[in-house]
């Protein structure tokens, strides 16, 4: 089976006819498109980029949701400001607001611990383990039994991999479960904040400019990775030393110009380009509109409840940024979808696939039943999603904590670690602890209670048959309750729990299930009461998941074979694993609403043009003065008569690529990917080379802001290779 799958996918790649700028390619696939890369301008041998422990791939790291890269031999890491936002917020107080004022550690001793649970992951190996995950026995199973067998096999593969201490291993699904790859990563656990610009630079334009062009945002920040004195990953300790990466990126201070080759290496989260037409219809017809509505309500409530309360506003700053980002993203997708022919094209392509399958008896026998089954299975999943959508917004934060703690106590009682749930094995305990510890910095009872009350009122107004009776009962609620009645019951629940206290909450981490059952803490009692129903729903979901995996994998096998027959490529959708995309620096001929063009670069002039002195369009006085006096230093571009701030490129990225280094033809750092344009976010579903543009922060602006404005000379010197053996000294 494995040999057949590999030949099928490889053949699809060799027949590649995708747009030159389309595709999030696995490193091992790059030689297959080597001629295209060379023609586009790559100076490196594409084969070198398949070697994950060599340059440049070894310099590219994951932060577990964002991408970053090593930029010095002393473990200096650069990423986006919005990727480090949680750590900046975590270290901020009303008295010392690093979000507002920025932060610079002049010495190693001044560097601050990142938010609990922060990690730097360095991918060192990727192996195809399809035959181990879907072994002959598992291949015969379906439903919940299949899900359980797949998880058991994954845990076994991961456990073997993690015998190499200091590494985190995961199994990632490709092509809808057709293939599985083992990803082995060095896990660096001591991460520290080195430098971030003030929010008026790192988030200039705020949510108004998010996903928009022209853009003038200095979306960059710096971490440093630390290890024990023996060079191995270790928990935070003052005795730890900077990690010395085998490879790091050099900064190309000359930057790029229009038409230059660029590529992005990173960890894109998820794309949906191979989805069924029914999935497109449900997502854009119901799911995204519901998400936008709920997100808008969340933002309004948080704004109302934090107004005039600085400490609460700081606590929810990272949460608000995250909600706002996806709120605008999903609305942008909906706007692009309206009037488009995406669904019609998806339906036509699906009909053509089915016709191709049905035209041959052998193909019909191999693929027919699963293609027929997948549509009804997806419909079943969508119905569950629709019915339980609001439920996901109703839970108080402390109830979530109580449920996690009780599940942990239950799983911990199982002596065989391999039989524990994924997410609750011993390898996961440090992460669970860190997440529970971090709640204090991102929680406010008034805000949390208002959110729960608002969404519970909506949920309890649904027909009783559409409500989860066990959940409603566990919280002491009843269908049809008014918001005032709900509020009164929530007051009792919050007053009866001590989980908001960190010491109390963390003490539960070491208690057994019997202690939970005996507790009179209101949220713990609710968690215990919900356990049986949680298992019932989990069993239901696992059964459906197993059926979907089985059918979807065969659907993808048929799709690859069909496109093979037409000489078309089928690269895998993004799944948070290391990928490479390439393109060029380019504007657009019709970017603006009036049909006028977008030039590829913005400059410092745009900052002063947008400056209002208030809110999202405030800017530091020192920056404005430097712009007025044309203190461009080494970073001015004569043709622009200014310093370039941001630029556009025809790169294929998505969420998770934030912080990805933009590299030139020699794999030197020329910027950081941090956004896309609003009308191109639909590329997650439907790539259009004419409109899709990535927005990057120009490395020349980063260097200018640090050197000329913020006087972060120690960081600039380290980036330039000066005094790198003693950073910050």
Question: Where are the predicted features?
Answer:
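Terminal presequence/propeptide segments associated with secretion/organelle targeting
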Residues: 2-5, 9-729
């Amino acid at each position: 089976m494995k040999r057949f799958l590999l030949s099928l996918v490889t053949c699809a790649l060799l027949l590649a006819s995708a747009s030159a700028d389309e595709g999030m390619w696995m490193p091992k696939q790059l030689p297959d498109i080597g001629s295209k890369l060379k023609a586009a301008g790559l100076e490196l041998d594409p084969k070198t980029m398949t070697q994950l422990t060599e340059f440049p791939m070894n310099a590219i790291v994951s932060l577990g949701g964002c991408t970053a890269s090593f930029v010095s031999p002393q473990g200096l890491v650069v990423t986006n400001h919005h990727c480090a936002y949680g750590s900046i917020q975590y270290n901020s107080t009303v008295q010392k607001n690093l979000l507002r004022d920025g932060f610079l550690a002049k010495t190693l001793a001044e560097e601050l611990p990142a938010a609990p649970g922060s990690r730097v992951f360095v991918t060192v190996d990727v192996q195809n383990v399809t035959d181990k995950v879907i072994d002959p026995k598992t291949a015969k199973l379906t439903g919940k039994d299949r899900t359980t067998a797949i998880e058991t096999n994954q845990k076994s593969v991961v456990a073997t991999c993690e015998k190499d201490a200091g590494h985190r291993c995961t199994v990632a699904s490709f092509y809808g479960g057709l293939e599985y790859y083992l990803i082995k990563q060095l896990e660096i656990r001591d991460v520290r904040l080195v430098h971030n610009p003030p929010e008026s630079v790192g988030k200039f334009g705020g949510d108004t400019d998010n996903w928009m062009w022209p853009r003038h945002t200095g979306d960059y920040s710096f971490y440093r990775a630390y290890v024990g004195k023996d060079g191995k990953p270790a928990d935070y300790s003052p005795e730890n030393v900077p990690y010395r990466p085998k490879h790091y990126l050099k900064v190309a201070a000359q930057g790029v110009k229009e038409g230059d080759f660029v590529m992005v290496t990173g960890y894109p989260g998820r794309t949906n380009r191979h989805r069924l037409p029914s999935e497109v219809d449900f997502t854009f017809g119901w799911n995204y509109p519901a998400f936008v509505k709920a997100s808008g309500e969340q933002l309004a409530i948080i704004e109302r409840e934090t107004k005039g309360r600085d400490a609460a506003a700081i606590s929810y700053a990272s949460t608000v940024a995250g909600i706002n980002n996806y709120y605008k993203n999903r609305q942008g997708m909906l706007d692009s979808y309206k009037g488009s022919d995406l669904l019609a094209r998806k339906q036509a392509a699906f009909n053509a696939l089915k016709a191709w399958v049905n035209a041959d008896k052998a193909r019909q026998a191999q693929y027919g039943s699963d293609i027929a089954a997948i549509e009804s299975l997806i419909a079943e999943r969508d119905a569950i999603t629709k019915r339980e959508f609001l439920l996901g917004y109703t839970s108080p934060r402390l109830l979530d904590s109580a449920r996690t703690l009780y599940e942990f106590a239950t799983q911990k009682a199982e002596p065989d670690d391999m039989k524990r749930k994924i997410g609750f094995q011993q390898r996961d305990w440090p992460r669970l602890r860190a997440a529970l510890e971090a709640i204090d910095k991102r929680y406010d009872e008034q805000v949390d209670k208002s959110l729960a009350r608002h969404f519970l009122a909506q949920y309890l107004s649904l027909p009783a048959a559409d409500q989860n009776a066990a959940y409603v009962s566990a919280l002491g609620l009843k269908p049809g309750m008014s918001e005032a009645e709900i509020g009164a019951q929530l007051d009792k629940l919050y007053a009866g729990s001590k989980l908001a206290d960190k010491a109390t909450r963390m003490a539960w981490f070491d208690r057994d299930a019997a202690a939970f059952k005996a507790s009179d803490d209101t949220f713990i009692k609710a968690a215990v009461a919900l356990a049986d129903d949680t298992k019932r729903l989990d069993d239901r979901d696992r059964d459906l998941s197993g059926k979907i995996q089985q059918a979807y994998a065969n659907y993808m096998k048929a799709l690859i074979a069909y496109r093979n027959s037409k000489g078309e490529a089928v690269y895998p959708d993004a799944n948070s694993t290391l990928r490479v995309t390439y393109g060029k620096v380019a504007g657009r001929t019709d970017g603006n609403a009036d049909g006028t063009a977008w030039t590829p670069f913005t400059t410092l002039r745009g900052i002063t043009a947008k400056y209002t002195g208030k809110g999202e369009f405030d800017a530091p006085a020192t920056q404005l003065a430097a712009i007025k006096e044309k203190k461009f230093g080494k970073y001015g571009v004569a043709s622009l008569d200014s310093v370039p701030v941001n630029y556009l490129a025809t790169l294929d990225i998505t969420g998770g690529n934030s912080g990805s280094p933009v590299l030139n033809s020699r794999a030197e750092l020329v910027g950081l990917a941090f956004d896309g344009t609003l009308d191109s976010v639909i590329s997650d579903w439907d790539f259009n080379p004419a409109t899709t543009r990535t927005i990057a922060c120009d490395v020349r602006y980063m260097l200018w802001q640090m050197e000329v404005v913020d006087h972060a000379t120690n960081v600039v010197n380290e980036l330039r290779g000066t005094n790198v053996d003693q950073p910050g000294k």
